[in-house]
Design a protein with these regions (language model features):
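Conserved alpha-helical substructure of the radical SAM core
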Residues: 2-143, 154, 158, 162, ...
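Local cysteine-cluster metal-coordination motifs and their immediate loop/turn environment
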Residues: 54-62, 281, 321-330
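Processing junctions and N-termini across compartments
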Residues: 47, 51-54, 255, 317-320
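Short, basic and Ser/Thr-rich N-terminal targeting/leader segments
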Residues: 43, 263-264, 319
Length: 337
């Protein structure tokens, strides 16, 4: 926790700190009064460089081809406009959503622009198609999350279809070696392992692999499922690694759904085409707010459409279909080391 606070502190200005206070104060006040109050602007922003991916993961809307919205890559112009407008109060950028960020040819340049605006940068990748380790280290990414869920190719490929575990290991090993050469502490490399039925037996092996490579952290994560058929196919046998409780052929989140959502007040998403999404669970941008290419971000953040959505969250969040499978407010990560 101390390390995390120290990391955040480096990117704080008086304006950003005041905005952070206003954002969370208005969020908690909204819960108490049950009406949307929005002071300030999002301290955290998720940006989608692309919704295209090189892998075919069976529980991912991009990987399965179930994503309905158009596919494409964010342009540098859209990214620059966004950063120019949000950087005075937004201190953290989460650079992924649906898709592999490094497929965008301008992605490294986007990272450099974000760092020029003194923004904390989080990036998640499947690490199969990376630029050179030198480019990645030079980009000063704060946290590089590597999604790889297996200690053997056979197990890994059951979920990360079309991926090669050996390439992932080789790429991450190269990044860590380049960090040492450059005497850089960044990026902190986090190996993220989604625990599923077919890979829970490899937890000790993956700990050994990540220790040997020298990653900064191994992070275990619970799997998100969508259909009844997924219960027996993907949910691990050990309930410790589940976010759901199962009754017969039905499943539901362990802790229910409360009429609140921190993300809607503090962490929206801008998709590759500039469309503002209320959160990362709105995969197909069903709740229309507006486009950053056509409006100022400040106008979108406090417009009527977003107000009405927040009001519904406070009134009856369970009536919003996408919220029924959202992990907001519950721990999705499992302590590993």
């Amino acid at each position: 926790m101390f390390e995390y606070l120290l990391m955040i502190f480096k990117y704080m200005t008086v304006k950003r700190l005041l905005n952070l206070f206003k954002s969370y104060t208005s969020y908690y006040l909204s819960i108490v009064l049950k009406i949307p109050i929005v002071w300030g602007y999002p301290p955290i922003l998720m940006i989608e460089p692309t919704n295209i991916c090189n892998l075919k993961c069976p529980l991912c809307p991009s990987g399965t081809g179930q994503l309905k919205r158009p596919k494409g890559y964010m342009t540098l112009d859209t990214f620059k406009k966004t950063i120019k407008e949000v950087s005075p109060y937004t201190f953290m950028l989460i650079m992924w959503n649906q898709g592999e960020p490094f497929l965008n040819k301008d992605f490294i340049e986007m990272c450099k622009i974000a760092k020029q605006h003194n923004m904390l940068l989080l990036v998640s990748t499947n690490a199969n198609l990376l630029p050179s380790a030198k480019e990645i280290v030079a980009a000063k990414i704060d946290r590089l999350i590597v999604s790889a869920d297996g200690a053997s190719q056979e197990t890994y490929n059951k979920y990360r279809r079309n991926g090669e575990l050996s390439i992932v290991v080789e790429n991450i090993d190269a990044i860590i070696k380049e960090k040492n050469i450059a005497k850089s502490k960044l990026p902190k490399v986090i190996w993220q392992f989604i625990v599923m039925k077919h890979n829970e037996h490899e937890l000790e092996k993956i700990k050994n692999i990540t220790d040997k490579i020298g990653v900064d952290q191994l992070q275990l994560k619970t799997v998100q499922i969508y259909e009844k058929e997924d219960i027996n196919k993907f949910l691990p046998n050990n309930p410790k690694y589940r976010r759901y409780k199962v009754r017969g052929n039905n499943f539901e989140l362990k802790y229910g759904i409360k009429n609140r959502c921190r993300r809607i007040w503090t962490q929206p998403v801008i998709n590759w085409d500039g469309e503002l999404a209320v959160c990362c669970f709105d995969k197909d941008n069903d709740f229309k707010i507006g486009n950053i290419n056509e409006h100022l971000f400040k106008e979108l953040w406090k417009n009527k459409s977003f107000y009405n959505f927040r009001a519904q969250i406070l009134k009856d969040r369970a009536k919003i279909e996408m919220c029924k499978n959202c992990g907001e407010g519950i721990s999705l990560k499992i302590k590993s080391k």
